[in-house]
Amino acid sequence: MKIPGVATVLGGVTNGVAQTVRAGARLPGSAAAAVQTLASPVLELTGPVVQSVVQTTGRAIGVRGSHNESPDGMTPPVRWRSGRRVHFDLDPLLPFPRWHEHAAMVEEPVRRIPGVAEAHVEGSLGRLVVELEPDADSDIAVDEVRDVVSAVAADIFLAGSVSSPNSAPFADPGNPLAILVPLTAAAMDLVAMGATVTGWVARLPAAPQTTRALAALINHQPRMVSLMESRLGRVGTDIALAATTAAANGLTQSLGTPLLDLVQRSLQISEAAAHRRVWRDREPALASPRRPQAPVVPIISSAGAKSQEPRHSWAAAAAGEASHVVVGGSIDAAIDTAKGSRAGPVEQYVNQAANGSLIAAASALVAGGGTEDAAGAILAGVPRAAHMGRQAFAAVLGRGLANTGQLVLDPGALRRLDRVRVVVIDGAALRGDNRAVLHAQGDEPGWDDDRVYEVADALLHGEQAPEPDPDELPATGARLRWAPAQGPSATPAQGLEHADLVVDGQCVGSVDVGWEVDPYAIPLLQTAHRTGARVVLRHVAGTEDLSASVGSTHPPGTPLLKLVRELRADRGPVLLITAVHRDFASTDTLAALAIADVGVALDDPRGATPWTADLITGTDLAAAVRILSALPVARAASESAVHLAQGGTTLAGLLLVTGEQDKTTNPASFRRWLNPVNAAAATALVSGMWSAAKVLRMPDPTPQPLTAWHALDPEIVYSRLAGGSRPLAVEPGIPAWRRILDDLSYEPVMAPLRGPARTLAQLAVATRHELADPLTPILAVGAAASAIVGSNIDALLVAGVMTVNAITGGVQRLRAEAAAAELFAEQDQLVRRVVVPAVATTRRRLEAARHATRTATVSAKSLRVGDVIDLAAPEVVPADARLLVAEDLEVDESFLTGESLPVDKQVDPVAVNDPDRASMLFEGSTIVAGHARAIVVATGVGTAAHRAISAVADVETAAGVQARLRELTSKVLPMTLAGGAAVTALALLRRASLRQAVADGVAIAVAAVPEGLPLVATLSQLAAAQRLTARGALVRSPRTIEALGRVDTICFDKTGTLTENRLRVVCALPSSTAAERDPLPQTTDAPSAEVLRAAARASTQPHNGEGHAHATDEAILAAASALAGSLSSQGDSEWVVLAEVPFESSRGYAAAIGRVGTDGIPMLMLKGAPETILPRCRLADPGVDHEHAESVVRHLAEQGLRVLAVAQRTWDNGTTHDDETDADAVDAVAHDLELIGYVGLADTARSSSRPLIEALLDAERNVVLITGDHPITARAIARQLGLPADARVVTGAELAVLDEEAHAKLAADMQVFARVSPEQKVQIVAALQRCGRVTAMVGDGANDAAAIRMADVGIGVSGRGSSAARGAADIVLTDDDLGVLLDALVEGRSMWAGVRDAVTILVGGNVGEVLFTVIGTAFGAGRAPVGTRQLLLVNLLTDMFPALAVAVTSQFAEPDDAEYPTDDAAERAQREHRRAVLIGPTPSLDAPLLRQIVNRGVVTAAGATAAWAIGRWTPGTERRTATMGLTALVMTQLAQTLLTRRHSPLVIATALGSAGVLVGIIQTPVISHFFGCTPLGPVAWTGVFSATAGATAVSALAPKWLASTVGVVQPDERPDDAEDSDAGG
């Protein structure tokens, strides 16, 4: 489709530029002719634009005419035309509400026109959509349609109720204005550039920069833009501003600004062209007469103009200035969208910059600077970078989305992504393509709930019903009888239907039917969590299982419009993801889409078209996932653009003040047209494009189906998965350039360089991450400012410090990642994949899979959905799988559930809502007993274990020490900048030159920036991380070490963390034992040993080197073997086993038949659950003895023990050595048993657990135990670990009914939590944090991963721990000794103290430098007493090496083991040392540190000022005086540093070395002169040392007097001596 005028413009502009170049400098007339040549095609192009402006202006000033005026004679304008499809705008002809109710009167006559194939009215668009016949003359047919519509509209108008129009034309991406407006602006930029080049070549005089300043004032003043929009409309305003700017740039011969704007407009043109192409491709399906017509939702957009008439401009939206609306008149009250009314980071800065530039211009005029200076101030404050950064990001992102087929109706929505604070996900968008049974109920015998479910599910999927079990009935002739449909609901529906299951005419059950969840629902929610926005889910039927994945939920039927409106009012801009289905109330959905700041709708071809959406995606959620991925990137891109704009404005202002801007007279100078503002804009443009490209390069999400496999019959599961009907994981696409590079890297010449190149690339990426620090822009601007005022050396220093810090941090990051990769590189797990023969039917293939003997050993990573795997004890399950065969199967799922005991598994389906899902195996669980075959249903990111880490909303990692240092920097920087301003002001008062005064002020401000802070934080954390790694704690995130120093609450997962997750025998009690005997007897007692011997005889013995069949067998046999003299290492040497019956959950016991010796009487020995064994026993007094037995069992259970009863009887039958026959015989004979006693088993606590808990409690730390075990077990374990015996146990059920406030209050007082889910673990940690606690979470399972991430410090336990837990952890314990936790806490304290003292040195020294410089400037000769190079010297000698030495040195001196006579004494000293450190005051970077900084700054300034004053009062030059002040400035700081770490050899050596370097520099003539100093004599050195000693003595000997004099409280709660003594313990 052609766009009117585009070819003309392109050709004309190209010819005009060529003529301009050829014209050269021949004469002004030629240049003028060339400019005219350039401008003529632009004027030709602006016809449609001018028409739009005239219409908008006419509406604004009320020229539209009377509302009662008939549109007779008007013809409907063609709004869009492509091929045989034409859109006619009906709004001008039918200017009254509810006109679309007369749509049939328009459609019928048009359909009768020859050449018209189809015609229908899209009420939401206000358009008549016509499709012409292939052989029709399109021009004639269009004219006839316009005539017919005009006549029909006149009749409707006369019969209709005329009122004020409240609708406006729909603007689609096919509107020519979408391209014409940015193309017009680009052409104007080319004209301006041509005029500029012509002026340069012809040496024509340029207009003053006041011209450009006036254009900038109009273009970048929000109030001015709003005023113009209210008069000209957005299109007119955009064109007027573009013309004004282009004219100003051409007259002033400025090339940089139009060039940048041309690049920006080119991006907008390419974006609009891409959207236009997608509109052309998708319009036939979206505007199809076969789709239901959407209700017309009247919308009023209050953004921009004052008029309350609904309005929209596509062209303005393409520039990000308008919101998309669709209007009509079917309901009474219009909805005010207010899209874009909440300012984002760019808008906030633009307003600030507008006010600031006006103030700066006014100040320049008041100071007598003239109009040129005022114009320079305005131009310096232009926020061009802020605008262009966001525009570039949105344009590239929009073009990328269009290239994947996504229809962007409002490009302005992409410009609003940076301000989204709430993500609302409508459950309707999560609906998959297939129906699903959500609830089943059986109503007849032989039809239980599970049977009804599987039959109904098979019917929904068009499958044959599975064969019934023996106790079930066949499903021959089964069908679903649906309840009468109610039609689309008037209120939001929940997507639920009811049906009866009918078999042979009889209703045997009923089902509730909804929809499967979209496979991309989980990736969508996971991505939403990573955006940092609040995630809200409105449920529909079937999405309840996703509740734990969001911040808040709302039940089905909640009005979406009301929800979005309330969230936007309470929390900020909202992004809505929804879909319009035919069984939902589309009015509510369309209205919600209209008011959402960003409305994303999935396209359901069976439902109404969501015209009110800003973006219409495809039928799945993959594109919505990418849009959500763009949110944090958009926010970061806008913030980066704002920072660049601030930096450009700062540097431009500095150039203006120093007069550097006027030095370049050549108009074609690169420095002139690429000024700081334009340089910042160019950087923001490239950065925005790169950020958008990063989003588009993200791999497509992997689908994660949430089918209820556990509730389906194995045959159904096998047919769906092994039959290939389920999609496999999406393979990530590899860009072509990456494939080419990979191919080249394997060439013989390049192969040796592959490794180093990869390492350098990784280092570059890591370094770039380190540079993403808020201090980096500040330091970069400071370096540029130093270069501007001539201090290139200082600029290089700051840049060098930034680079060294980033590289150091990058190296540390790579080291940590490499160590973590080495630790986490799990051994390539091998698994037996069953080779299934190729047979005809699914049922036969399933039987073959169950019984096939051929297997192939493959890597677990190669498994795919549908593979059948073979598993046996003690193998680890490699993927989520549905059981096909389960023989005596028990599985340890403690890593996922927290339950320490194995769980039984079965093949039969379980209820769809059954939380145990006994027919499933989950990745990471361990086969404890039995054998299994299962079909893989999920691998990789789709497994339950992997989802555990991202299953909880709003989980964020704690801020590190960098964040606190940035906060401190934000407090200190204003003071240092004020010091620089004070130096400049004082110098001006002393009549110094403006340039010199500004140079001194900049030098002080830049020198006072604590550029060493990032390096101090990095190296201190690196040192602490290395020390901890050497002790067995791998630090994956060094930034969290700082939180270790503040941790006051440690939360422990029990199973696998404090315990070994291995059963052990705790006690063995004879049956005659008292009911509540306490303490329990030792197993070495003779009666207990007999019970243990009997239990061992009943246990299944390992055969042929195989493992134990059951965990209880292993524990009992191990305990029996430990009884010296009673049992041998392999069992009872006198016991001869005749037959064994292994434990099965269906039996509830294990049994063995044997005899003692060769002549002994055969005996039947049993052990099992008391509820199974006791009823089979012979009791003397059944009532009393049974009650006594139950009391004993209850008492043992209350101790947290798993209880087994042991019994025996004589065996009179023979054995067949056939397991099944013997099992049946035993079960028949196992009555009238003799009860021998009971065995109590429990999880084995780690040997280091109790000492750790006791040490933490002794160090006044709060310990919280969190477990999934029963409350009785939890209480018993807590007592064993050293927690108070009366500790109350709170269950997850109790937590579930509490609100956040009650939750926090309860969590603050409790120490033991039992039966908690993974989500509740996160809630417990969050509640503790709300109470002000600094938390650490220690765990090893996937169910701990989210809580580990939530805690301030996450600690994972290695070994058998889950990879999810280790991946979420900040610190990983690499061995079984939990005592290293104490070392970690001590290291955290030490690091905090080191950082605190290093920050005091850095910032306090800078404060002293500022104070000294201000005093010297005020009382000196108007010059700062120290210059830029001298401040450089101070930073080198006092800030860098001494501060770093302090940062990496522990404040607390550890005891030396060699000083103690015995190991016990050394261990005692270590314990006392740890306790002394941990119970001491918590180091802080808050108010106490600020007081230390002020004190150090005052002492430093006092010493330097005293030496400087002595120099002034003694004979000598001014340079000598300045040198004395500089020397005392350094010496005073070094002396205070020595006081801070006088026990550290490293600090002493560094301080003395720095002092020696200073003396050498001062006394060496050439070097001294280079730094602006002079060698000092004896008198001068005496004055320096006296001043240094006096100031240092005041700091050390009279801290209280110093504090009261300065006016602050001394921060140190203890003097260093006390700290050292305590530390030494």
Swiss-Prot record:
Residue numbers annotated as active site: 1053
InterPro entries per the UniProt record, alphabetical: ATPase_P-typ_cation-transptr_C, ATPase_P-typ_cyto_dom_N, ATPase_P-typ_P_site, ATPase_P-typ_TM_dom_sf, ATPase_P-typ_transduc_dom_A_sf, HAD-like_sf, HAD_sf, P_typ_ATPase
Enzyme Commission number(s): 7.2.2.-
Transmembrane domains' residue ranges: 148-168, 177-197, 358-378, 637-657, 673-693, 778-798, 968-988, 997-1017, 1401-1421, 1432-1452, 1547-1567
UniProt membrane topology term: Multi-pass membrane protein
Annotated residues for binding of Mg(2+): 1340, 1344
UniProt-recorded Gene Ontology molecular function terms: ATP binding; ATP hydrolysis activity; metal ion binding; P-type calcium transporter activity
Compartments where found: Cell membrane
Catalytic function, reaction form: ATP + H2O = ADP + phosphate + H(+)
Keywords associated with the record: ATP-binding, Cell membrane, Magnesium, Membrane, Metal-binding, Nucleotide-binding, Phosphoprotein, Translocase, Transmembrane, Transmembrane helix
Top-level lineage group: Bacteria
Pfam families linked to this entry: Cation_ATPase_C, E1-E2_ATPase, Hydrolase
Enzyme class: translocase
Signal peptide: none
Family affiliation: Belongs to the cation transport ATPase (P-type) (TC 3.A.3) family.
Protein's name in the database: Probable cation-transporting ATPase I
Taxon lineage: Bacteria, Bacillati, Actinomycetota, Actinomycetes, Mycobacteriales
